[in-house]
Amino acid sequence: MKKTIWAVLIVLMSSTLAAHATELKVGEKAPNLSLKDSQGNVFTLDSPEFKGKVLSIFYINPDAIDLNRHVEDALIKDNELDRQTSYKSFNITNLKAGKLPNFVYKSAIKNKREKTGGVILLDYDNTVLNLWGLKNRSDVIVLDKERICRYIYNGKLPPAEVDKLIKVIKEYQVK
């Protein structure tokens, strides 16, 4: 009987540990993900829109949606980023972190998508948090063309970090 109890405890503990990945770090390959946009289209890191491009990913808590708007604006203004062939930026909204009902956020996301034409993916169940080991906050992540993490920052980026982010993107878009 004791062996059975120990076996059950070991299985439970190992499945709990497996459910929470270690936090993604610079230099590590990011596990692929599969998320939908507000239209129901499925995207992975290998989707045609992203394949072969350096990616800047804004993982957003919807209650702090404008936290890094200044970073998005700086990226849009930078004419040296090759958006046609080697660079793409997109948002992932962590709907589970929001305090309001999802329909409120989805409406705002739809308006932003129509205004900017950008890709905004929806994380309903902490998929990215669990897969990449992120915390429940806003993060900015840069993945190179091979999906190696080259930059990660948690929270609001100060001006020096915005410059560093852009420099990293430019460095890897030509490799």
Language-model features, listed with the residues they occupy:
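Positively charged n-region of N-terminal signal peptides that target proteins for export
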Residues: 1-4
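Structural microenvironment flanking redox-active thiols in thiol-disulfide oxidoreductases
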Residues: 61-112
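Short, internal strand/loop/helix patches
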Residues: 88-92, 103-136
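Short active-site neighborhood of thiol/selenol oxidoreductases, capturing the structured segment around
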Residues: 45-69
